[in-house]
Amino acid sequence: MSKSASRARLADIIRARSFGRGEITLASGRKSDFYFNLKPTMLDPEGAALLAELTFEALREDNVDYIGGLEMGAVPLAGAIAQLSWLKNHPIAAFFVRKKPKEHGARLSVEGLSKTETLQGKRVVIVEDVTTTGGSAIKAAESVREAGGVIVLVLTMVDREEGATEAFAAAGLPFRSLYKASEFLKS
């Protein structure tokens, strides 16, 4: 399937499984009359495969070592991309950032690394399913920076176009999206 056909098919899946209209309170606390819940798309076999493929292709030239983001939205996405990257002989390891460190065990903020792995000096992409203000991805980026990682990009599947671009610019974080909310609001 061509990139444009994959993108169109994924948009259809998002529209059918993950986009809705109706009053909702977003993670940012804002109210909205439309929403995206990408978990049904990320956990659908075809949706996961297309998200991984399009994301992997968007990152192929960025020489990325790790991909991850804030739990929960980034977890299935980072895992799917890591698996596909292995199959494409261009491995990108996955991790996730806890919203708050566990109060037992190793008390880690960044999870998924082995005892011998570190993000120190590694090129990292922060992924997110849906971005509104950018707050969640910025929180993940701060944890990665504290662990020594170098953020090369924040990549979201859907940008709600509600201030994230400006927030990422202010935080010194390059930002791209696969889709913009306006693409779904037209239909």
UniProtKB/Swiss-Prot annotation:
It is an enzyme of class 2 (transferase). It catalyses: orotidine 5'-phosphate + diphosphate = orotate + 5-phospho-alpha-D-ribose 1-diphosphate. The keyword Transferase applies. One of its GO terms (biological process) is 'de novo' UMP biosynthetic process. Orotate binds at T132, R160. Gene3D superfamilies: 3.40.50.2020. GO terms for molecular function: magnesium ion binding; orotate phosphoribosyltransferase activity. Keywords: Glycosyltransferase, Magnesium, Pyrimidine biosynthesis, Transferase. Pathway: Pyrimidine metabolism; UMP biosynthesis via de novo pathway; UMP from orotate: step 1/2. 5-phospho-alpha-D-ribose 1-diphosphate binds at R98, K99, K102, H104, E128, D129, V130, T131, T132, T133, G134, G135, S136. Its EC number is 2.4.2.10. InterPro entries: OPRT, Or_phspho_trans_dom, PRibTrfase_dom, PRTase-like. The keyword Lipoprotein does not apply. It holds the Pfam family Pribosyltran. Its cofactor is Mg(2+). Homodimer. Catalyzes the transfer of a ribosyl phosphate group from 5-phosphoribose 1-diphosphate to orotate, leading to the formation of orotidine monophosphate (OMP). Belongs to the purine/pyrimidine phosphoribosyltransferase family. PyrE subfamily. HAMAP family: PyrE. This is Orotate phosphoribosyltransferase.
